[in-house]
Amino acid sequence: VLGPDEKGLIEIKGKHVFSGYLNDKKATENALSSDGWFSSGDIGSLSKEGHIRFHGRLKDMLKVGGENVAALEIEAYFDSHEEVLISQVVGVDDDHLGEVPALFVERKPGSKISKEDLIVFSKGQISNFKIPRYIVFIDDWPMSSTKVQKFKLKNFDLGEKVFGK
């Protein structure tokens, strides 16, 4: 069990949690621990007030120039910036690297942070292949009832590359 606002894997247990996948023992074994905890595959945190905040999918991976990169890792780095309210990363096609990260950022109220500021923030702190090639500022996220619909972010106008070839 983690402390308030610490990120971790969301796991659920209780009489209302399903007992397994119909006719799929392997999927059931992957989803449920031996003592009945269901692993959602989501990363989240629990506030002091008891509210769960969704941060991303554990399996949301990009393949950048042959390197496996967790979108959540890049998001966590940019979420640590004092002027970033929320960030989301999706992979977009790239002729040179196959796929590159595109960063979507909602700035905190009153923030004037620029794309260039975010690139400077990341250089020398995270690996170059993890630095977003595109940055889009956004205030209105495409949402389901509970999560950002990342697949819809891929349809946004990314603008010009801000880093790399």
Predicted regions span which residues?
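Acidic/polar alpha-helix N-cap and adjacent early helical turns
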Residues: 156-165
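Proteins with a high burden of low-complexity, intrinsically disordered sequence enriched in S/T/G/P/A and R
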Residues: 1-3, 10, 146, 164-165
